[in-house]
Amino acid sequence: LDLDHFKEVNDQLGHMAGDQVLQETGLILKSVVRSTDLSGRLGGDEFVLFIQNAADRRGLERCAEKLVSALNRTFSSAEYSVTVSASIGIVPVQGGESFAQLYEAADKALYEVKRTRRNGYQFAASAAEPVL
């Protein structure tokens, strides 16, 4: 998961505002995913989520839709107001894939969303192909 246009937050409003948006994003992620799921910040404006026991593709879609909706919002304080959205790349675990394969597949799907529309999600084609 990547925040859309986050660089502008830091560039226009400063790193304190950016840090506040990142902290609030973490709280939103925690509130949307189940207690059995795992979410964390990788760095910058990039987050990773592990959704445990997703029953099927539709369950992952529902989770992604909730996340996109919850993160498409205006963050405000006395000093600033900025609207941020999120793009998400999804890769279902089939079994046997390495973390590198899963990460690369999700990253490709994420950047396809960012390239074509932003504020949405896309499933990866496959994570089973070897990483070169």
Predicted feature descriptions by range:
Residues S39, K66, Y80-S81, S87-R117, ...:
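Cyclic nucleotide signaling catalytic output domains
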Residues S31-T36, V68-S81, E112:
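Short catalytic/binding micro-motifs of nucleotide second-messenger systems
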Residues F50-I51, P92:
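A structural signal for hydrophobic residues in beta-strands of small regulatory alpha/beta folds
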Residues L1, F47, A86-I90:
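A structural signal for short, well-ordered beta-strand segments
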Residues A54-A55, E97:
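Conserved phosphotransfer active-site motifs of two-component signaling proteins
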